Amino acid sequence: VRESFEDAWGVKLDAEPGHRIPNMFDEALSGGFKGLYCQGEDIAQSDPNTRHVEAALESMECLIVQDIFLNETAKFAHVFLPGSSFLEKDGTFTNAERRISRVRKAMEPLGGKADWEATLGLAQALGCDWDYENPEQIMAEIAALTPSFAGVTYEKIERLGSVQWPCTDVVSEGTPTMHEDSFTRGLGQFVVTEYVPTVERCTRRFPLIMTTGRILSQYNVGAQTRRTENSTWHAEDVLEIHPADAESRGISDGDWVGIASRIG
């Protein structure tokens, strides 16, 4: 598989996996990670340790953000590219059920380009020899290089309505249920996970541990839903404290409080 990608792309793939997002931030602050192309993700809003994330974004020599909103990450961008919403996209969508379905745009992108077209233009500006003309060609390349997608075509998706990978020459119409008899390596492998305690500790100065949670009216960090009428259902964030902890600190329901931690 690696050789297929190297032949198709004309490059030598690194033998080791690349950095994960937290490692990117650490490397950026130490000077070893200088540029990031952030597409459809508001890492300044959603990732933990905000000060650390913002310092990393500020330290980069080139930060390109592509999104449908001028989000928190965009405030640090050197270049901002407009993204396209689901109503403006043409292509496929693969969900957590492994189901590949067609997506058809209802309107032209207000920013003038679909996401893939903006990515294509950036790649060409950087000297890449990319010549895709439509999303179907991109899916054809995925099918040519990814064994579990080898049998996926737009024609098949249109004919069947959707396809679940793996979809190969052997399983030409997809795989509704995987691992019916066994796993690829045989029987299931159970692993004992070693307990790793949290680094946070209650101290005399910081006697409570705080964690973030979810609210019904907002999806995840609310990158999209906070820009809708959903915000009228939950106009401001609240801090929830155990009644005993609140009483011992003289805090009543509805009071304003200040919050401080070891990192800010």
Locate each region found by the language model.
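Non-catalytic alpha/beta scaffold blocks inside enzyme catalytic domains
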Residues: V1-G151, I209, G213-G264
